[in-house]
């Protein structure tokens, strides 16, 4: 049975973990589908959905380059679902600042009508885990793993906030674009990847 073709942008970050989560989501859903790592424009053009994993957002933006970012932007604006995780959320945003250095000037996709603050909870040593609820996604409980995580400081009227922590926005959805501050691939819970798979079906 055929199903959606999901790509994980493999320039940086937890690529294998996200691929594993999508494999689990496909298996649990009992549907067809495939997942692969992608890093060039021609491969992205063939996808039904794209995951942009965590890492260093300024590096990802630089490595991606103009053509790759343009193809992602065109595909997503044409309706392809995208899922940005941590640095991937930053890349999808329309504006980013850093807690320490202010404006970053990094390349952004401007696909989510949000502004974000990088490293909002502090650096690596301030990493933490906490329980979240995403009832609008059908997920009552989810373990959020926050590692040098951003927060969403502004969200436009078309953006649905799907999770908050300490009165801070940490997960949003705008149409077919999903963005989270935390790392769902570092848990044993594929619920959020299953939700994204449904978006791509």
Swiss-Prot record:
CDD domains named among the record's database cross-references: GATase1_PB (cd01749)
Chain positions recorded as L-glutamine binding sites: 55-57, 118, 147-148
Catalytic reactions on record: aldehydo-D-ribose 5-phosphate + D-glyceraldehyde 3-phosphate + L-glutamine = pyridoxal 5'-phosphate + L-glutamate + phosphate + 3 H2O + H(+); L-glutamine + H2O = L-glutamate + NH4(+)
Pathway: Cofactor biosynthesis; pyridoxal 5'-phosphate biosynthesis
Entry's Gene Ontology molecular function annotations: glutaminase activity; pyridoxal 5'-phosphate synthase (glutamine hydrolysing) activity
Coiled coil segments of this chain: none
Keywords: Glutamine amidotransferase, Hydrolase, Lyase, Pyridoxal phosphate
Keyword Cytoplasm appears in the UniProt entry: no
GO biological process: glutamine catabolic process; pyridoxal phosphate biosynthetic process; pyridoxine metabolic process
EC number: 4.3.3.6, 3.5.1.2
Entry annotated with the keyword Cell cycle: no
Active site: 86 (nucleophile), 183 (charge relay system), 185 (charge relay system)
GO CC, one annotated term: cytosol
Classification via InterPro entries: Class_I_gatase-like, PdxT/SNO, PdxT/SNO_CS
NCBIfam families given in the database record: PLP_synth_Pdx2
Family: Belongs to the glutaminase PdxT/SNO family.
Assembly mode: In the presence of PdxS, forms a dodecamer of heterodimers. Only shows activity in the heterodimer.
Function: Catalyzes the hydrolysis of glutamine to glutamate and ammonia as part of the biosynthesis of pyridoxal 5'-phosphate. The resulting ammonia molecule is channeled to the active site of PdxS.
Name of the protein described by the UniProt record: Pyridoxal 5'-phosphate synthase subunit PdxT
Species of provenance: Cenarchaeum symbiosum (strain A)
